[in-house]
Amino acid sequence: MKKLLLAAAILGSLPVAALAQDTAPDGSEAFGIEPYVGVLGGYHSFDRNTEFGSIPNDSKPSGALISGIAGINVPLGPVFAGVEGNASKGFDDIDWEYGVRGRFGARAGESGMIFGSAGYQWVNAKNGFPNRSDWMYGVGVEIGPKDIGLGGVTGSSGIRLRVQTETYDFDTFRPMAGVVFHF
C-alpha cells in the first residue's frame, strides 16, 4: 500500500514539476516581467447595425488604423498573463481609438506566443458618427525569429511579428498586423 501511495504521489507531482521550469521555451526567465512596445497597422470595419448608427446614405463606420501598443507580460512557466494599452490613429470614419486590455496565453515554439485578450476600447468617430466605448475581445499570435528560421540572423533579439484580430462588442472586425519589440 505504501508503494502505491508513493507512486501516486510521484505521478501527481510530475505536471507540477513541468510548470516549475527555470526558463521559458525561448530561453528567457520563466518568471519575471517582460515589457514590450509595438507598431501595428490594420482596418476596423463596423456592422451596419451597431450602436454607432448610420448616416443618411446607410453607410457604416470603418477605416484604416495605425496603432501604437505598450504592455507587460508576466511569464508563468509555459503560459503568461499581461496587460496592454493601445492608441490608434484612424482614417476615413475613425478619428482615434484607445484602450486597455488583459492578455492570457501560452508560449509556442522557440519564441512564439498564442494569446487571447479582453478589455475596454474607446472609439472617437467622425463624419457624423457618434463617439462610443465598449468591450473589446481578441485573439492573436506572435512569431519570433527562431520560429521562422532567422535565429542566426537576429540572434536572441526580442523582435516578434504579431497578427491579431479583435471585435468591438461583437459588432466589428478589426484585423491588425505589425512588429513588437520585447525587452
Protein language model regions, located:
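Gram-negative bacterial Sec-dependent N-terminal signal peptides
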Residues: 1-21
